[in-house]
Each structure stands twice: as C-alpha cells, then as structure tokens.
Amino acid sequence: MRGLFVGRFQPVHNGHLKALEYVFEEVEEVIIGIGSAQVSHTLKNPFTTSERMEMLIRALDEKGIPRGKYFLVALPDINFNSIWAPYVEAIVPKFDIVFTGNSLVAQLFRERGYKVIVQPMFRKDILSATEIRRRMIEDQTWEELVPKSVVEYIKEIKGVERIKMLATDLEKNEKELQTPLRIPEF
C-alpha cells in the first residue's frame, strides 16, 4: 500500500519526522509531496524545492529510511481548493491512503473517496517551521528542533542568514539607500 503525505517543509523539522515515522510504519511506500513548490526566498517559504528535497533525503537517511521506500514530488500551489485533490492525483504516482494533520486536506481527499488518517501534530507549540524560522531570526536556539543532518545542511547553504535577510525591512533599507546624502555646510 502507498500513502501520501504533503508538507511545505520550510524547514524539515522533528515534527515532520515524527509524523513520517508513523506513516512509514503503516504503508510500504510513501509519496512525500512538497507543497508551495514554486515559492522560495520569502519569509514564509525561504527554501527552494530542491533544498527541501535535500533536507528530506538527509533527514530520512539519518533515520535509516531506505530511499526506495519514498518518492519526493514537487507540488506547486494552485490556490483553488475544490480542485486541489484531483490536481495532486494528476501529478503524483497512484496512492491508496492520505496522512495529514490539516483538516482541509483531509476533507478534500475524503470527498475524493480516499481513506484519510488525521495525525495529531507532535509538540506543535515548538515543532513548527514558523517557530523555527522565528528562532533563527531572533538568534534563539533552534537546532534541537530539527534533525542534525538538516542543521548541517541549513548551515551549508547559509539558510539562517537568508532568513534573517528576508526578515529585514528591505523597503525601508532601500528608501534609505536612495535618499540623497546631505553634506553639512561649514
């Protein structure tokens, strides 16, 4: 049996891995859909699809999950909820069951006749990508919330620096740069 699990993975964290561990116990193969695949270099979606794929591969390798047990599939947004499930069906290989922590995703796939297992979020108070990005911006400890291999990769690609840059008020900085210098008169 093949399952579907969709996330944005901005970045991959221990909550994602906990959910995926459960999915791998339930099915032989997993399709991991990488949502918002067309978006990167924004505060909400700082990492590219290929960077998120690399994070997933490294994290699953670290957990000892064989690469032959999963597929990674990029899922660009369509912003049209009523046709999102058939859109996903058209992009990914055939699947039998959907695993999600999102009630809308659950409803959309139930309407298509799929069995859906709604997973409780594991420590959602701290194991959320939003919280991890916030900690990065504020120079707080974030490393224990993500797999070691993902910490290493984020450092390799200077991901924290990217997120901090995205969090700055670029518009204000641009205006300051374009303001003519006033030379004081003596």
Swiss-Prot record:
Protein's GO biological process: NAD biosynthetic process
Highest taxon in the source lineage: Archaea
InterPro entries: Cyt_trans-like, NMN_Atrans_arc, Rossmann-like_a/b/a_fold
Family: Belongs to the archaeal NMN adenylyltransferase family.
Keywords linked to the UniProt accession: ATP-binding, Cytoplasm, NAD, Nucleotide-binding, Nucleotidyltransferase, Pyridine nucleotide biosynthesis, Transferase
Reaction catalysed by this enzyme: beta-nicotinamide D-ribonucleotide + ATP + H(+) = diphosphate + NAD(+)
Protein name: Nicotinamide-nucleotide adenylyltransferase
Pfam families recorded: CTP_transf_like (PF01467)
Record localization: Cytoplasm
Organism listed in the record: Thermococcus sibiricus (strain DSM 12597 / MM 739)
Pathway: Cofactor biosynthesis; NAD(+) biosynthesis; NAD(+) from nicotinamide D-ribonucleotide: step 1/1
EC number: 2.7.7.1
